[in-house]
Design a protein with these regions (language model features):
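An N-terminal, well-structured beta->alpha segment
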Residues: 1-73, 152-185
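Gly/Ser/Thr-enriched, mixed-charge loops and adjacent short helices
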Residues: 13, 113-239
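N-terminal small/polar loop signature for handling phosphorylated ligands or for N-terminal nucleophile
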Residues: 36, 48-112, 200-259
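Short glycine-centered, acidic/aromatic-flanked micro-motifs in structured strand/loop junctions
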Residues: 52-53, 187-189, 260, 341, ...
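Proline/glycine-rich low-complexity loops and linkers
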Residues: 71, 131-165, 169, 260-333, ...
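Short beta-strand-to-turn element immediately C-terminal to the catalytic PLP-Schiff-base lysine
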Residues: 117-120, 257-261, 338-340
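Phosphate-binding and adjacent anionic-ligand microenvironments
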Residues: 245, 283-463
Length: 463
């Protein structure tokens, strides 16, 4: 069974039996549940729902079912075609729609797909709203329209350009400095929608580029998660020389990673750190990232006189906390940049434009820019448990044990995070399988891994 239901939507592998995978019957059920929620929540007077998708092989099939179901529920559909996640988010806001559905499984392999659900602001649903949709779907408590009240279908392919124009209009995007820098970059678009929109953005910025895996056919050339072990091709290309940097995105272009001019990874955790440093140097203020993200953002924020706040993991949790503390920038350590001057969503186009602006103004190499930030390393481990294990009870014991130590700050808004003076470890339970994910950070990878292993042993001893 691969069908995973969450507050942000549903995802699963294509094919199989109803209830077990992402198949036509479940796509209809959850689309109808979402449409029912939108209608009865009365958050918008619009009768239009935006639909956009990445270039996955299954995307055309899923899109047809989603659009037909929405029309059957009486909603007008605005299909913006092949589009990034942030483009679709912006399209909801620009068109004053009632909501939006993004068809993408983000960094998951090619045989996966998903429905991601947006509110009228083009932002992901809150936990309470998401649970309402799941409850409606579970009860199949929806009613389709009669023949006289079916929705209409419209296509609009202009939102890619409108997205680019909105990025170029941001005050901190220094188009002149970027153009004068004469950057030459390599781009890995992982055979998805980045191959459509990133060339247009780079041309508008006056950047010379070489596309790798640029054909948006959904047949991903490698594992689509933008991590070093998956990026041998572009790292090798840049290592040959002649490039100022490499740009890597995931299939729906909400995650962003950079590669230094020498072919080495800039570090996905440092995408947000570097962009935040640039933004804070021009507009001092507060920042937010999730509990599993690098401490380097806190250090950079405090250096600029701001206050850093951690949120629970998940984009909607980050954006909610950003609004609470009036953060000028935030995001997630997986390469997700959220810049409220644009919109409250992870956006690789915004990240690219701000990063290039910073690099152009500083006049340095990417590796030199990376060296200006605090050096931390994150280790990732997991604890496999039995289905009968009371994970919450274990996490409570960890909290109690370390809460007695004066030099440890304990945070329990999302699992348990233990902040030591010079390192941290975060334990989170999975919502879909009996495991605890263990993230740890320190000044060396060896120390980070040792800390994670130590907490793993603590958990084993508690069983």
């Amino acid at each position: 069974m691969t069908l995973i239901k969450s507050i942000s939507g549903i995802r699963g592998t294509i094919g199989g039996q109803a209830g077990d995978t992402l198949n036509p019957l479940d796509i209809v059920k959850f689309t109808a549940a979402y449409a029912t929620f939108i209608r009865y929540s009365k958050q918008s007077e619009s009768n239009t729902i935006v639909v956009g998708r990445d270039a996955r092989i299954s995307g055309e099939m899923v899109k047809n079912i989603v659009c037909g179901t929405l029309m059957g529920m009486g909603y007008d559909v605005l299909n913006i075609g092949l589009a990034t996640t942030p483009t679709t988010e912006l399209a909801v806001r620009m068109s004053k729609a009632a909501g939006g559905i993004i068809i993408t499984a983000s960094h998951n392999p090619r045989h996966w797909n998903a429905l991601k659900l947006l509110n009228q602001e083009g932002e992901f649903l809150t936990k309470d709203n998401g649970n309402e949709v799941l409850e409606i779907a579970e009860k199949e408590n929806f009613e389709f329209s009669d023949v006289d009240h079916l929705g209409k279908y419209t296509e609009d392919s202009t939102f890619n350009q409108r997205h680019i124009e909105s990025v170029l209009a941001l005050k901190l995007v220094d188009r002149e400095a970027i153009r004068n820098a004469h950057f030459k970059v390599a781009v890995d678009a992982i055979n998805s929608v980045g191959g459509i929109i990133l060339p247009e953005l780079l041309k508008a910025l006056g950047v010379e580029y070489t596309m790798i895996n640029g054909e948006p056919n959904g047949d991903f050339a490698h594992n689509p998660e933008p991590l070093a072990q998956n990026l041998g091709g572009i790292m090798s290309e840049i290592g040959k020389g002649g490039y100022d940097l490499g740009i890597v995105v995931d299939p729906d272009v909400d995650r962003l990673a950079f590669i230094c001019e020498d072919g080495k990874m800039f570090g996905e955790e440092y995408t947000l750190v570097s962009v935040a440093d640039y933004v804070l140097s021009h507009t001092p203020g507060n920042t937010v990232s999730n509990l599993s993200s690098t401490r380097a953002l806190r250090d950079v924020t405090e250096r600029h006189g701001g206050v850093y706040t951690a949120s629970a993991v998940g984009e909607v949790n980050v954006t909610t906390k950003m609004k609470e503390v009036n953060a000028v920038i935030g995001g997630e350590g997986n390469g997700g940049v959220i810049y409220p001057e644009s919109h409250y969503g992870r956006d690789a186009l915004v990240g690219i434009a701000l990063f290039l602006s910073s690099l152009a103004q500083k006049g340095c190499k990417v590796s030199e820019l990376r060296a200006t930030f605090p050096e931390y390393f994150i280790a990732k481990n997991r604890i496999d448990l039995t289905a009968s294990t009371d994970v919450d009870a274990i996490l409570e014991k960890v909290k109690e044990q370390y809460g007695k130590q004066a030099d440890v700050k304990v945070t329990d808004i999302d699992g348990v995070k233990l902040d030591f003076p010079d390192k941290w470890v975060h334990l989170r339970k999975s919502n879909t399988e009996p495991i605890i994910r263990v993230y740890s950070e320190a000044s060396t990878m060896e120390e980070a891994d040792a800390l994670g292993k130590k907490l793993m042993q603590v958990v084993y001893d508690m069983q």
